[in-house]
Regions:
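Secreted/periplasmic carbohydrate-active enzymes, especially glycoside hydrolases
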Residues: 1-303
C-alpha cells in the first residue's frame, strides 16, 4: 500500500494559493486524516520570513484530502525559486485485515508553488506567456546547473536523480525530462509522480506510442505532458494523444516542413553533436528561432 500523499496546487493568485494533499482512502481506518503544515518560503536568491500554514481536513470523500491556504504566496520561478517544506502525517490508523496497524511515520519534503499551464499555442509560467529555451545534456551533472542558470537555459535530460531534481529546484533551472520505455502504465504513473514533486520539472516528454488515456494526467498534475514526434511526422488532430498538453517536435538540421497544429503549443528541438558550452548552445536557440520564423511562433526552442 502506497501511503505517501500526493501534493497539488489548486486555485492560485497573488492574494492566495490553495495547496492540497491527497491519499486514497482504501485500506485506511474510518477516522484517518492527513494533518500537517506547509512551512516557508525560503530561497537562495531572496530573503524571506517563513510562515507555518496548517493543512485542514476537507471531510468525507473517496480520498483523504487536506488543504492549506497560503496567503501572499511566493511562487516558484527560475528567477526566484521559492521553496516551501511540507510536513504531513496520517492521523488515525491503517486498517490491516483484522487488526488496526499504527500510522506510518510523518512525511517531510520540499515543495514549490508554481503556476504553469498552456493557453492556445503558448506556454504560460507565473501567469505570463513564456517561451522555453534550453539545451540537451546526455549526462547532466549537478555542476551544470550553475551554468544553466547563468545562461537562462532550461535543460532537456533523461533519468535525473533525486539529488539533481532537488538542486535544480533550489537553483531555479527548468527541466524537460524525456521518459524512455516505461512498460506497464503503473510504472509510468509512478515516474510521473516522482518527477512531479519538483517544481523544476516543467515538461515530461513521452513517446507518441504511449497507450495512455487522458487519466494519466492525474499522475502529473503539476507539470505538462509533451508528445514526442520525430522529424517529418505528420500531425493530423487524430494523431495527437489525449493526454498531450504540448507537442515536442524533433527536427532535422534543415527541417522546413513542420505543420504547427493551431490549437496547442509546439516546442522545436534540433539535436546537435556540437560539444559547446551551455551558454553557446543556449545562444543557438535564438538561431533556431530565426530559422523557424517563417513557420510561425513556437512555444519553445531547444538544441
Amino acid at each position: 500500500m502506497n501511503l505517501e500523499p500526493q501534493l497539488f496546487i489548486g486555485d492560485a493568485s497573488d492574494a492566495e494559493a490553495r495547496v492540497y494533499a491527497t491519499l486514497p482512502r482504501a485500506g485506511l481506518a474510518d477516522d484517518a486524516q492527513l494533518i500537517g503544515e506547509l512551512i516557508g518560503p525560503h530561497c537562495r536568491y531572496s530573503k524571506t520570513l517563513p510562515a507555518r500554514i496548517r493543512f485542514v481536513d476537507r471531510g468525507p470523500g473517496p480520498t483523504l484530502l487536506a488543504e492549506a491556504v497560503v496567503p501572499d504566496p511566493c511562487f516558484w520561478t527560475p528567477e526566484l525559486p521559492f521553496m516551501y517544506s511540507v510536513e504531513l502525517r496520517l492521523a488515525g490508523a491503517v486498517a490491516a485485515e483484522n487488526e488496526i496497524a499504527p500510522a506510518p511515520p510523518a512525511m517531510r519534503r520540499p515543495f514549490g508553488i508554481r503556476r504553469l499551464g498552456v493557453h492556445g499555442t503558448s506556454i504560460y509560467l507565473d501567469a505570463k506567456r513564456f517561451v522555453l529555451r534550453g539545451v540537451h545534456l546526455d549526462a547532466p551533472k549537478i555542476e551544470d546547473l550553475k551554468a544553466a542558470r547563468e545562461a537562462a537555459s532550461a535543460l532537456y535530460i533523461e533519468e535525473p536523480s533525486e539529488a539533481f531534481l532537488q538542486e535544480a529546484s533550489e537553483e531555479g533551472v527548468l527541466l524537460v525530462v524525456r521518459l524512455g520505455e516505461m512498460g506497464a502504465q503503473g510504472k509510468l504513473a509512478m515516474e510521473l509522480a516522482r518527477l512531479g514533486r519538483w517544481p523544476a520539472v516543467a515538461i515530461a516528454v513521452l513517446n507518441d506510442e504511449v497507450p495512455a488515456g487522458k487519466e494519466i494526467r492525474l499522475s502529473a498534475r503539476s507539470m505538462l505532458l509533451a508528445q514526442r514526434l520525430n522529424s517529418g511526422a505528420a500531425t493530423p488532430p487524430a494523431s495527437i494523444a489525449p493526454w498531450a498538453h504540448v507537442l515536442w517536435w524533433e527536427i532535422g538540421p534543415t527541417e522546413s516542413a513542420i505543420v504547427q497544429p493551431p490549437h496547442m503549443p509546439v516546442v522545436a528541438y534540433r539535436p546537435t553533436a556540437e560539444p559547446a558550452a551551455i551558454a553557446q548552445r543556449r545562444r543557438n536557440c535564438d538561431h533556431l528561432q530565426a530559422d523557424l520564423a517563417p513557420l510561425g511562433d513556437f512555444a519553445g526552442y531547444f538544441t
